[in-house]
Design a protein with these regions (language model features):
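Terminal amphipathic alpha-helical/low-complexity segments used for targeting or macromolecular assembly
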Residues: 1-31, 130-131, 137-143
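Long amphipathic N-terminal alpha/beta scaffold segment
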Residues: 19-49
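Left-handed beta-helix
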Residues: 36, 41-42, 47-48, 56-57, ...
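Active-site-proximal flexible loops/turns
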Residues: 76-77, 134
């Protein structure tokens, strides 16, 4: 996360080469693709150092999120739009969030779930494709 923050800072300053160096180091050290252009909110953390996480460079992730290992946040073919993840959301290990969708605030995405549709605030989704199994949750009950 520190390398991402450093690369994002260089990116926001308009320094062209240093964000790419940070991106390359993230790939080498963590086997992940987390780009400096990606907007990731404060206090968001990666479980197990973000091993094998792939996040599209145009994705937006809110504050206070937890992203498990092997998570993919990206587009779908023939679409240039990518997911937006609300604040306080937990993305379980191996989950895939794909396409022009919005994951609401304080949601829980189960391990290995494939999310292809919007998820309302305070919901739990699981499965392939992901389905809502609980609504109006208190996220502190889940992590």
């Amino acid at each position: 996360m520190k390398l991402y923050r450093l690369g994002n800072w260089f990116f926001r300053l308009g320094i062209p080469l240093l964000p790419m160096v940070c991106d390359a180091l993230i790939r080498i050290l963590h086997n992940s693709a987390v780009y400096s252009q990606t907007k990731i909110g404060k206090n968001t953390v990666f479980g197990y150092g973000g091993i094998s996480v792939v996040i599209h460079k145009n994705a937006v992730i809110g504050k206070n999120c937890v992203i498990g290992p092997n998570v993919t946040i990206g587009g779908k073919s023939k679409s240039t739009r990518v997911p937006t993840i609300g604040s306080g959301t937990y993305l379980g290990s191996g989950s895939k969030i794909l396409g022009d969708i919005l994951i609401g605030q304080n949601c829980v995405v189960g391990a290995n779930a494939v999310v292809l549709n919007d998820v309302p605030d305070n919901s739990v989704v699981v499965g392939i494709p992901a389905k809502i199994i609980r609504s109006n949750i208190n996220p502190k009950d889940f992590y």
